[in-house]
A protein has these predicted regions:
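Hydrophobic adenine-recognition pocket in adenosine-nucleotide-binding enzymes
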Residues: 108
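Class I (Rossmann-like) S-adenosyl-L-methionine-dependent methyltransferase catalytic domain
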Residues: 1-98, 112-119, 123-194
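A conserved beta-strand element that flanks and buttresses the S-adenosyl-L-methionine
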Residues: 104
Length: 194
């Protein structure tokens, strides 16, 4: 991982209202959407793993809205872990025994090299018994979508096909960043699958 995820990084991209990528309002809307779709698909939501939990916006949302959900948050940043209360773990090297109904991995994968991405997906799949929400900016996103004044562009720029290939073996795409672990108990209509 090329980036130092220190206080300066978090101030620049997440804590400053003037320069942050996302704030509470955006993550609240995203969390409602993700959990709403899981409810629509009939999935249980008892345990959540948040990989690269950063400033803890998902953690805060679950605490306010679904406080009975068992929530576990990880980050590689010593700063984020101390300030926001996460476990310090690297998903490319760590695989826990617990299984989760939802694994969240938002904005993490582009920091890994290719082998790190492969290990991260394998580890998340092993711990997922339901859904994965994955957000990873792609080379096209970097060219055409992101606000470069607010987005850390010091990442591995990869085509979407790279992530789709990695996920295909272990997850079924459902659209909007949501996937379901292969071999799970859910069946989806053709047009629900991404």
């Amino acid at each position: 991982m090329p980036q130092a995820f220190d206080a300066g990084y978090f101030r620049r991209y997440y804590e400053s209202r003037r320069s942050r990528v996302y704030g509470r309002e955006q993550i609240d809307a995203l969390a409602r959407g993700v959990t709403g779709f899981i409810g629509w698909f009939g999935g249980p939501l008892e345990a959540v793993l948040d990989v690269g939990a950063g400033t803890g916006l998902w953690k805060d949302w679950f605490g306010r809205n679904l406080p009975d959900v068992r929530y576990r948050s990880l980050d590689v940043s010593a700063y984020a872990c101390e300030r926001y209360g996460h476990e310090r773990r690297d998903i490319t090297r760590w695989r826990g025994r617990e299984r989760f109904d939802l694994v969240i991995c938002q904005g993490v994968m582009p920091y890994f090299d290719d082998q790190g991405c492969e290990r991260a997906v394998a580890n998340m799949a092993a711990m997922c018994r339901g859904f994965l929400y994955l957000e990873a900016i792609t080379s096209r996103d970097l060219r055409e979508v992101v606000d470069r004044s607010r987005t850390d562009v010091s990442v591995h720029a990869r085509p979407a096909s790279f992530y789709r290939r990695l996920l295909r073996e272990r997850f079924e795409p459902l659209g909007c960043g949501l996937h379901h672990v292969r071999g799970g108990d859910k069946v989806f209509y053709d047009l629900e699958r991404g």
